[in-house]
A protein has these predicted regions:
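Second-shell residues forming the walls of enzyme active-site clefts
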Residues: 2-129, 133-144, 149, 156-157
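N-terminal hydrophobic targeting/anchoring segments and the immediately downstream early-domain regions
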Residues: 159-161
């Protein structure tokens, strides 16, 4: 998370230099308690003692820490891929995030031309997307996600507010 940084990732990449053991002892613990959540979002921060890449692009952090150590098996969504913390064109950013193990790429600017650029690198979605687990074809660990269950949980979350 962003807890150890005062940098706003909308504009610049926060870099956290905390020793890895301290991160495991304190920072990652709360996430272990939330490992059964259906959804989670990556933070655009860099843990310098773990990887040179931001979390969103780091296969090491996503696979070894989020998926294995924390035990998160749900849908992993990027924070807004167009934020200033990340470098490179949007298509490359989306590709790096998916290759690292994110399931969905979030794009929030509303710029349709940017959306088209990102969509070009994504796998083709069939009309039966809601009934199939297309995300499992993207995922590195190939575990199936039940899209229908996630959709129903999302609807319930919307009705809470």
């Amino acid at each position: 998370g962003h807890g150890r940084s005062s940098i706003d990732s909308h504009f610049k990449l926060p870099i956290i230099n905390t020793p890895i053991q301290k991160l495991y002892e304190t920072d990652f613990k709360p996430f272990k308690n939330l490992c059964f959540s259906s959804y989670a979002m990556t933070a655009h921060v860099r843990y310098a003692t773990i990887d040179k890449l931001p979390v969103t692009f780091s296969e090491k952090i996503i696979q070894e820490i989020i998926r294995e150590y924390i035990g998160f098996k749900g849908l992993l969504i990027t924070d807004d891929i167009s934020m200033g913390a990340l470098k490179g064109n949007l298509s490359k950013r989306a590709e790096l995030a998916l290759n690292a193990g994110c399931d969905l790429v979030l794009h929030c600017s509303g710029d349709i031309s940017e959306m088209y650029k990102i969509a070009r690198i994504l796998p083709e979605f069939k009309s039966s997307f809601a009934n199939k687990t297309i995300i499992s074809n993207i995922r590195k660990d190939k575990k199936t996600i039940n899209i229908n269950i996630l959709r129903d949980e999302f609807k319930l979350m919307l009705h809470k507010y």
